Regions:
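Bacterial signal peptide processing site
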Residues: 24-27
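Extracytoplasmic substrate-binding proteins
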Residues: 34, 44, 134-211, 232-234, ...
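Short helix-initiation/N-cap motifs at beta->coil->alpha
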Residues: 40-42, 101-114, 235-244
Length: 354
């Protein structure tokens, strides 16, 4: 009896000591290291010292995150449309593991499914800057939330820098920004040569509903920088539906087809789109209908490769002015410098739809 009591007392004392030791260690342990990053909405975001994974709500930013980090290993989740773009892009070649990134934490409308996000348990999440309700909810859940503004090339550059801070890749981020800035500086040197030249009328078209890139889109900047004029520059909004009659009145010299839908130049050349008459449009008659390229992401939207997109448009509009570079060489240089990857001829054909 005495031995049994002594053993029980000893076990109890050991348990109490263990609990007290645990409490003491909790009280004296140093707080987890944090970093503070300011997003493009001006919010201070507290991040863990090491960001092990991120979830990305806005469609284009997953490709930007890959470019900044040089890897997709930390991209735990992305938008379903970003995954659809991935399947047709160079990311599938450069980052096959990105195919495993989750998409069920975010809806097509960018609504965030908090339960699914919780399963991912990311170190941080990237959202659109206008998602104020979601940001408030994520803050309550203590999920570090980075809000990024989007719409212009400058927005992309600011976002690149923020993501560089998130990943601890500030120097690489600056190299990407300089890459963009150097190409844009090249276009500044071409303004004098474009003076007095006729500006081709360009229609930027998206899907069978005849949505066009209106004056509020980055596509207007792309076209104008390349020496053209967006026929829809006075149309309000972003991607705005118009009528076939309006397109006939514009009678564009060049048509660029978006990568957000499957329509191909042949669909216009062969008049395959029901209820639409393309055969009398100048761009169709003269064979100047082109499918926009897709590299890391669809070049239609602001992205890491936007300056290359402008170079592509420029050679379609003014090959005499912009004959001092080979876009294929520029592409090869970009992929070799940032991803240590040599583009094959097949890769180039895929990117440029040739």
């Amino acid at each position: 009896m005495t031995h049994r009591f002594s053993f029980g007392l000893l076990a109890g004392l050991l348990l109490i000591c263990a609990v007290l030791a645990g409490c003491g260690s909790q009280q004296t342990s140093a707080p987890k290291a944090e970093r503070v990053v300011t997003d493009t909405a001006g919010r201070e975001v507290h991040l863990p010292e090491e960001v092990k994974s991120i979830a990305v709500v806005p469609i284009p930013w997953a490709s930007v995150a890959f470019a900044v980090d040089g890897s997709a290993d930390r991209i735990a989740g992305m938008h379903p449309s970003a995954k659809a773009s991935y399947e047709k892009s160079m990311l599938k070649v450069l980052a096959p593991g990105m195919a495993n990134a989750a998409t069920d934490f975010v809806g097509q409308d960018f609504s965030i499914h908090m339960e699914e996000l919780g399963k991912l348990n990311p170190s941080a999440i990237i959202v659109w800057n206008y998602q104020e309700d979601e940001i408030a909810q994520l803050e309550k859940l203590k999920v570090p939330t980075i809000a990024l503004k989007y719409g212009t090339l400058e927005d992309v550059q600011q976002g690149i820098r923020v993501i560089g801070q998130v990943f601890g890749k500030e120097e690489r981020a600056e190299e990407l920004v300089r890459f963009q800035q150097d190409i844009m500086a090249y276009f500044e040197t071409k303004k004098a040569e474009l003076e007095g030249k006729a500006k081709p009328k360009v229609l930027y078209l998206r899907d069978r509903d005849l949505k066009v890139a209106a004056g509020g889109t980055v596509n207007t900047m792309m076209i104008e920088t390349a020496g053209g004029v967006n026929v829809a520059k006075d149309v309000q909004g972003q991607w705005t539906p118009v009528t076939m009659e309006q397109i006939a009145a514009w009678d564009p010299d060049v048509i660029i087809l978006s990568n957000f839908d499957p329509i191909q130049p042949a669909d216009l050349f062969e008049d395959k789109l029901e209820g639409q008459n393309w055969k009398n449009i100048k761009a169709v008659r003269e064979g100047r209908v082109y499918k926009a390229p897709i590299g890391l992401y669809r070049w239609d939207a602001p992205c890491v490769e936007t300056p290359l997109m402008i170079k592509w448009i420029a050679q379609k509009l003014h090959p005499d002015v912009f004959g001092d570079y080979r876009l294929t060489d520029d592409l090869r240089g970009f992929y070799e410098k940032f991803f240590s990857y040599t583009l094959t001829d097949a890769d180039l054909k895929m990117i440029l739809h040739e």
